[in-house]
C-alpha cells in the first residue's frame, strides 16, 4: 500500500478546534487502515503574524514568499519550530507516535535555490526515502516542515505544496493538499470536481485561478504527472469527510495527470 502524504495549510494552525477535528479524523483513519501516513506543513499565517509583531515586511512574488537573508532564521523558527511542534503536540494528545522533522533530515528532499530575487527560497527535488521509510515501518507519523537545506547547508524556505510533491515522488506516495477552501472554484464560485492541465491553463488565463492557488494547482499537476495518479485538493474544514478522503473518495477537486 502506498504511503499517503497529507499537506496541511491555510489558517488551520491557528485553530485549536480545527486541529482537534483533524487529529480525530487521523486517529479514526489510522485505527481502520494500515496505510502509512505523513504530514507536510507550511505555516504562512504564523509567519505573517510573527512578521507583523516584529514590524518586518511581508513580500510575495507570484504567490511565493520573498525570504531575505535577515528573515530566514525567523521563518525557520516559525515553521520548523512553532508550527512543527504545535502539530507534534496535537499528535501526542491523540496518542499518535510522531516525529517532527524538516525536509533536510535524512536528505529526504533535496533543495536548490529557486530565484535570487526571492532570497532564501528553495526548489524541492526528490531525495532519499531511507529515513522516512524506516520511521514509517516502525509505526511513526512523520510531521515535516517545509524548511530545507541546500548541499552547502543554507537554510531555505520551500513552498509547502511543492515540498509535499517532492516527498510524494521520493516515497511513491499518494498526495492530498488540504487548505482553507473546499477545492478549486470556477468563475461562479462553484467547486470543480476534476481538473486537467488544459482546464487549469484556461482558468489561469481568465484570471479565475490567481496568486497562491496557481502555485498549489501547478504543484498538484506536477505531482499527478510525476506520480502517474490523481492528486486531491480539499478543505480541512469538513472533518467528518476526511476519513473518506484519506481512503480515496474525492471531496474537493481531483487533479488529473
From Swiss-Prot:
This protein's UniProt keywords: Amino-acid biosynthesis, Arginine biosynthesis, ATP-binding, Cytoplasm, Kinase, Nucleotide-binding, Transferase
Cited SUPFAM superfamilies: Carbamate kinase-like
InterPro entries (UniProt xref): AceGlu_kinase-like_sf (IPR036393), AcgluKinase_fam (IPR004662), ArgB (IPR037528), Asp/Glu/Uridylate_kinase (IPR001048), NAGK-NC (IPR041731)
Binding residue positions for ATP: 180-185, 208-210
Pathway noted in the entry: Amino-acid biosynthesis; L-arginine biosynthesis; N(2)-acetyl-L-ornithine from L-glutamate: step 2/4
A Pfam family annotated for this UniProt entry: AA_kinase
Highest taxon above the source species: Bacteria
Entry-linked CDD domains: AAK_NAGK-NC
Reactions that this protein is recorded to catalyse: N-acetyl-L-glutamate + ATP = N-acetyl-L-glutamyl 5-phosphate + ADP
Gene Ontology BP, a term: arginine biosynthetic process via ornithine
Cellular component aspect of the GO annotation: cytoplasm
Compartment list: Cytoplasm
Root EC class: transferase
Site positions for Transition state stabilizer: 7, 216
Function: Catalyzes the ATP-dependent phosphorylation of N-acetyl-L-glutamate.
Protein name: Acetylglutamate kinase
Source species of the chain: Sodalis glossinidius (strain morsitans)
Gene name tied to this protein: argB
